[in-house]
């Protein structure tokens, strides 16, 4: 019988947001995991018949938290600080079929750091297979810390809430979304710059209360910014490499800027997206799409 892993292991409140279904250790720092992607999802909606590539990033994120708790002894209540997260999806293998996609994941952990017996952080790389074919690759690096250290680090930021009222969203179609509630960008008077919309009531992007803007929200802002450059040309984010340099606070404006890079000879396009808050960079993302996605 197949079921999802306990939601607590992947830091999700809603069972519907859990994509991992099992795991086992295959070597000292190597693991085999299984996952399932639904044919339809309330937020990670298919793009031109292809699974949303950000579903790969969310699956990769869940891998790190699960292994930390289940295999590396990280206590519930410890906090995770994500430094980078990346994916590369093969759209020719990622088409939505007649049944949910059952995935097998090969995970290799490295740069494992400990403070005494406590895990302090690590890096891991993931290869995702579907039907024996590689559907995506990716990885991430993070630190983890005790609640006491996190409290000292965040201070009075713990418990902060977002900017109200929410700024007006862009038109959903201009950023590749169907619903206004799923739009995370708001227009500004400056070209290729938007204000981040932080809707803490969103049931997927804010699955549970947090005291900062989640990394997946920042990655979604990069995807939407890349699409907003030219809404008439679909932008399937087959590659994303995000780096998080500091917390993006909920209660201060965050500005998202996009810089289109020259297209490759084969039509592949890349956009560099950065997020700034109080004149400081909080994240950067290099996001790409294949020429065939146009």
Curated annotation (Swiss-Prot):
Pfam families: AfsA. This is 2-oxo-3-(phosphooxy)propyl 3-oxoalkanoate synthase. InterPro entries: AfsA-like, AfsA_hotdog_dom. Belongs to the AfsA family. It comes from Streptomyces virginiae (Streptomyces cinnamonensis). Its EC number is 2.3.1.277. Involved in the biosynthesis of virginiae butanolide (VB), a gamma-butyrolactone autoregulator that triggers the production of the streptogramin antibiotic virginiamycin. GO terms for molecular function: transferase activity. Disulfide bonds: none annotated. It catalyses: a medium-chain 3-oxoacyl-[ACP] + dihydroxyacetone phosphate = a (4-alkanoyl-5-oxo-2,5-dihydrofuran-3-yl)methyl phosphate + holo-[ACP] + H2O. Keywords: Transferase. It is an enzyme of class 2 (transferase). Disruption phenotype: Null mutant is unable to produce virginiamycin. Addition of VB restores the deficiency of virginiamycin production.
């Amino acid at each position: 019988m197949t079921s999802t892993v306990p939601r607590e292991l992947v830091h999700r409140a809603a069972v519907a947001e859990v994509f991992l279904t099992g795991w086992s250790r295959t070597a000292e720092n190597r693991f085999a995991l299984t996952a399932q992607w639904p044919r339809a999802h309330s937020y990670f909606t298919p793009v031109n018949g292809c699974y949303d590539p950000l579903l790969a990033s969310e699956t990769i994120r869940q891998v790190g938290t699960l292994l930390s708790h289940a295999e590396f002894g990280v206590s519930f209540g410890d906090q995770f600080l994500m430094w980078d997260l990346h994916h590369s999806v093969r759209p020719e293998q990622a088409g939505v079929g007649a049944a949910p996609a059952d995935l097998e994941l090969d995970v290799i952990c490295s740069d494992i750091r400990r403070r005494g017996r406590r895990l302090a952080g690590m890096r891991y790389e993931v290869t995702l297979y579907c039907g024996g074919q590689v559907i995506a690759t990716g990885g991430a690096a993070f630190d983890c810390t005790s609640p006491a250290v996190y409290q000292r680090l965040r201070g009075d930021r713990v418990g902060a809430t977002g900017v109200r009222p929410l700024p007006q969203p862009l038109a959903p179609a201009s950023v590749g979304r169907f619903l206004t509630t799923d739009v995370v960008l708001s227009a500004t008077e400056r070209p290729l710059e938007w204000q981040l919309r932080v809707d803490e009531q969103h049931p997927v992007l804010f699955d549970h209360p947090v005291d900062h803007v989640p990394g997946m929200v920042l990655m979604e802002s990069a995807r939407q910014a890349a699409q907003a450059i030219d809404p008439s040309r679909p932008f399937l984010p087959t590659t994303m490499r995000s780096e998080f340099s500091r917390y993006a606070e909920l209660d201060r404006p965050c500005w998202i800027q996009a810089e289109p890079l020259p297209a490759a000879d084969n039509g592949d396009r890349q956009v560099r997206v950065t997020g700034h808050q109080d004149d400081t960079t909080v994240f950067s993302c290099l996001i790409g799409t294949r020429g065939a996605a146009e």
